[in-house]
Amino acid sequence: MFYPDLFSTCKQFGNNFINTKIPITMNAVTIDFNSVIKITDEQFYQLCQDNPNVKFERNAKGEIIVMPPTGGETGNRNFEISVDFGIWNRQTKLGVCFDSSTCFKLPNGADRSPDVSWIKQERWDTLTPEQKEKFPPIAPDFVLELMSPTDTLKETQSKLQEYIDNGVRLSWLINRKTRRVEIYRQGQEVEVLQSPIELSGEDVLPGFVLNLQTIWD
């Protein structure tokens, strides 16, 4: 019932639709406003700022995706993974780490928020202060997606491939339910691992090793 109302609001108020408050949904919902209004980058950014309790993404077609909140088990494991990355990055000082609240503007026009991401310091430093403050217009060097019960495998795989197609050098898709990991690399076939104990950051994340035991437990 909410989404038709939002659509009507968009028709009536045009650019002012960004002031509409969005409720939290338990399943990802894709909304296409393209037939009514072309949402600019600034409008999308403002929509996110006006609804801080809701996580949004936007695909390359300009459709807005309302993401569900993360459950306790997935959230806990996301935190543990982020801690491991944070410790490694503080020790090496090679780049900048981000959590799932950070949205990146990819070269294909999509706005994506990986669960964990990392950018090499030299690339991060090429951005202006304003670009860093808003949704950085850059593809991370590394991204990780930890599937939650509300995610679909096909859509998540498509997202991981999108990252690679837009310049991400290494990405991991971790599926707790099947204990399977998919590794995406530039110019290579996807590597699938069943119940691995650890993952290496290879030459993208020098010296980093992610222990997966806490993820599988």
Predicted features, each with a name:
Residues F2-D217:
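Gly/Pro/Ser/Thr-rich low-complexity, intrinsically disordered segments predominantly at protein N-termini
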